[in-house]
Amino acid sequence: MKIRSKDLLTGAELDRKEILGIIESAIRLKKGGRSKAHPLDGRTLAMVFQKPSTRTRVSFAAGMFQLGGEAIYLPPGDMQLSRGETIPDTARALSGYVDVIVARVFGHETIEEIAASASVPVINGLSDTFHPCQILADLMTIKERKGRLKGLRAAWIGDGNNVCNSLLYGCAAVGIDISVATPAVFRPIPGVVDKCRESIDVKLTTDPAEAAAGADIVFTDTFASIHNMDKERERKFLPKYRVNAPLMKKAADDAIFMHCLPAKRGQEVDGEVIDGPQSAVWDEAENRLHSQKALLLALGI
């Protein structure tokens, strides 16, 4: 199955059929293990990363290798961007060398500029407002754990950040209702919320217990970038928005806990939750590999 969009920048580009197709493909790839088939033989992925990365970098590089392709890691200091070359010129030049670009950037406008200038597909590996690759892995993990997506209810606790924004789009596409508990000043993008409310029930609250009540999945993320910690920002969330055992008891008995990682135990989540029996975070992390392999195939590169 080939998706309609050239690029994946926010998650809104994918409809229900496309997301389910990617998930089904990812599950097949995971079950199939290391295949001798190399559908991306001769293809090259450029990884343009302005920010540090563990899961995104390694999962894309390993995924391309397993599919028979190559991945080139391009940190800021290794590119002429650091010496004043424009983003459009860089994107146009890279398009002549590689088959797909993954960019991990500070400002979302940068990924939009890359996509507008590149003639090859561009994937958002994380920006300040969206993280669509994470949501494909999340939805795959939920499907594995719950056996379905439509009709479930999710709770997001903490910061209405880039992951939350893309999660809203993903939930809207597959029919998962969601309650988002954040401080009033840290809510997700209003336009994203309004769009998703056309398809699903989206509740916004400042009360984590209200959001978690009866939830099938409980999500959280760091309250500030782990590479650029803002202690004053963190204090606006603690201890009220920490996911702990009492909060998980508000959720459904068979609820799962999810976190995109990296995590700060004792900050946004207690160790007994992230390391406990309800935690799906390690499946979630592994599924970055499988879902992104499926995405690369769906882009038709």
From Swiss-Prot:
For the keyword rRNA processing, the answer is no
Give the matching InterPro entries.
Asp/Orn_carbamoyltranf_P-bd, Asp/Orn_carbamoylTrfase, Asp/Orn_carbamoylTrfase_sf, Asp_carbamoyltransf_Asp/Orn-bd, Orn/put_carbamltrans, OTCase_ArgI
**What are the subcellular locations of this protein?**
Cytoplasm
Gene Ontology molecular function terms on file:
amino acid binding; ornithine carbamoyltransferase activity
Q: Which GO terms describe its biological process?
A: arginine biosynthetic process via ornithine; citrulline biosynthetic process; L-arginine biosynthetic process
Q: Which residues bind L-ornithine?
A: N162, D221, S225, I226
Binding residues for carbamoyl phosphate: S53, T54, R55, T56, Q80, R104, H131, P132, C133, Q134, C260, L261, R288
Top-rank taxon: Archaea
The chemistry this enzyme catalyses reads:
carbamoyl phosphate + L-ornithine = L-citrulline + phosphate + H(+)
EC numbers on record: 2.1.3.3
Task: Look up keyword Transferase and say if it applies.
Answer: yes
Q: Which GO terms describe its cellular component?
A: cytoplasm
Q: Describe which pathway this protein belongs to, using the record's wording.
A: Amino-acid biosynthesis; L-arginine biosynthesis; L-arginine from L-ornithine and carbamoyl phosphate: step 1/3
Chief place of localization: cytoplasm
Keyword entries, A-Z: Amino-acid biosynthesis, Arginine biosynthesis, Cytoplasm, Transferase
Identify the NCBIfam families for this entry: orni_carb_tr, PRK00779.1
* Listed PANTHER family: ORNITHINE CARBAMOYLTRANSFERASE, MITOCHONDRIAL, ORNITHINE TRANSCARBAMYLASE, MITOCHONDRIAL
Q: What family does this chain come from, according to its entry?
A: Belongs to the aspartate/ornithine carbamoyltransferase superfamily. OTCase family.
Task: Explain the purpose of this protein.
Answer: Reversibly catalyzes the transfer of the carbamoyl group from carbamoyl phosphate (CP) to the N(epsilon) atom of ornithine (ORN) to produce L-citrulline.
Report what the protein is called.
Ornithine carbamoyltransferase
